[in-house]
Amino acid sequence: MCGGYYSYNEPHRPEFPGESRYQGQVLHPQFWPEDLDYEGKKVIVIGSGATAMTIVPSMTQKGAQVTMVQRSPTYVVSRPAEDKIANTLRKWLPEKWAYAITRLKNTTLSGYFYRQTRSQPAKTKAQLLGMATANLGEEMVKAHFTPSYNPWDQRMCLIPDGDLYQSINEGSAQVVTGDIETWTEQGLVMKDGTEVTGDIIVTATGITLTVMSGIAFDLDGTAINFPDTFTYKGMMYSGIPNMAHTFGYINASWTLRADLTAEYVCRLLNHMTANQQAVATPTLRPEDANMPTEDWIQDFSAGYMRRMMHLFPKQGQGPWRNTQDYKLDKKMIRRAPIEDGVLVFGDSGNIAPAMDSPTLTKVA
């Protein structure tokens, strides 16, 4: 299953007091109208996640005056839109070598940074706020870009070439932080009395996670309840045969884990073909009966994740883990033997032809 991880039909859309009073246009980013005309208009964007921080500078660049209204601040990091090292390597090295070196650089640096946020949160926080202050000034950062939590307790926002900062410094974007008291005919009133007016309100209020794209599965006529299962290597489910699910990293590039999952599935299918096996089922062993359990995702307090955690499989020990650690996953997923005493295989005819392993994951 590679169906994504959030609902395309039902975004997270809380109701606000007084919404019916508002006389302007209201829209959610998941249902963006193609003919939306906002040039020269005042726009209110409610939210402080990646969606809001992408929308705000984009709309200002096309002539809108935008106010981003956030309940609480988010860590924001400016990164170059283009990787100069990668571009230089491509000029002088074969494409395959340049790609491999760039990938190794990026995975190493992102892994190091995440581990630093866990081991030295105060130091990392000071570094991040220092970079933001260099772009916006101390007063702005203290008021609107200093989260109450530590880095990577929730996802951070990367902005290309500081585009959000540029919009703020140019005066085409503003930030208001606090709780919304009510909507009015012209916009919003905050609990501290601040009034925000706009012709359009964009509710960038988040996504709704789904498990297996919300599809109902059954096994021999019995409905499958995924919270009753344990995750196997972050991709399969205890007691459920021949089913794998792609779920990436929340603390690194999503596709790193998607690559590993695809490679493992190909390895597994080729192993089953070579051994005339048609069924592979992750199966709890007697020694797994009393292992401690944890949520599908640990040490991550983002609301969109915590709201839906009860729908996901549990974690345990050994292979029953969703590590969210690329270095560990490479060992567990790429190098560990297929026959590990946990996967139980069954025989049958009608074996599918062997599949080639993805070449993309052969580096790094």
Language-model regions, residue ranges each:
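Soluble, non-transmembrane catalytic domains of enzymes that act on hydrophobic metabolites at membranes
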Residues: 56-61, 65-83, 275
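Short, charge-rich amphipathic segments
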Residues: 55-66, 90-105, 192-205, 294-299, ...
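Flavin (primarily FAD) cofactor-binding/catalytic cores of flavoenzymes
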Residues: 1-44, 48-50, 54-57, 61-68, ...
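Hydrophobic transmembrane alpha-helix bundles
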Residues: 8, 106-115, 177-188, 310-333
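C-terminal, flexible cofactor-proximal segment of oxidoreductases
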Residues: 52, 74-78, 87-90, 231, ...
